[in-house]
Swiss-Prot record:
It is a peripheral membrane protein. Produces ATP from ADP in the presence of a proton gradient across the membrane. Belongs to the ATPase epsilon chain family. SUPFAM superfamilies: Epsilon subunit of F1F0-ATP synthase N-terminal domain. It comes from Micrococcus luteus (strain ATCC 4698 / DSM 20030 / JCM 1464 / CCM 169 / CCUG 5858 / IAM 1056 / NBRC 3333 / NCIMB 9278 / NCTC 2665 / VKM Ac-2230) (Micrococcus lysodeikticus). This is ATP synthase epsilon chain.
């Protein structure tokens, strides 16, 4: 089964990395969803929740603010100005 190699980083540190089956995030142009095999792209990250569906069936959420979202050959890098694990309801 194809998978994504995902990395979420902020200016200060690495937030999370691992294998995923899907990733969704907010860009300045709206929500985007990424599955394995997605075409390469680069987007400006908006403020909001990043949701990673891990290959073991779990979910990782992070709050991200500003930065970039890139996809290339099943590698997803979310380079946020600031980010932290957890959803908005936990804040």
């Amino acid at each position: 089964m194809a998978e994504l190699n995902v990395e979420i980083v902020s200016e200060e540190r690495s937030i999370w990395s691992g294998a995923a089956s899907a990733v969704s995030a907010r860009t300045v142009n709206g929500e985007i969803g990424i599955l394995p095999g997605h075409t390469p792209m680069l987007a400006v990250l908006g403020d909001g929740e990043v949701v990673v569906r891990t290959t073991d069936g779990g979910t990782v959420t992070a709050q991200a603010h500003g930065g970039f979202f890139s996809v290339d050959h099943d590698r997803v890098v979310i380079a946020a100005t600031s980010a932290r694990l957890g959803d908005a309801a936990a804040a």
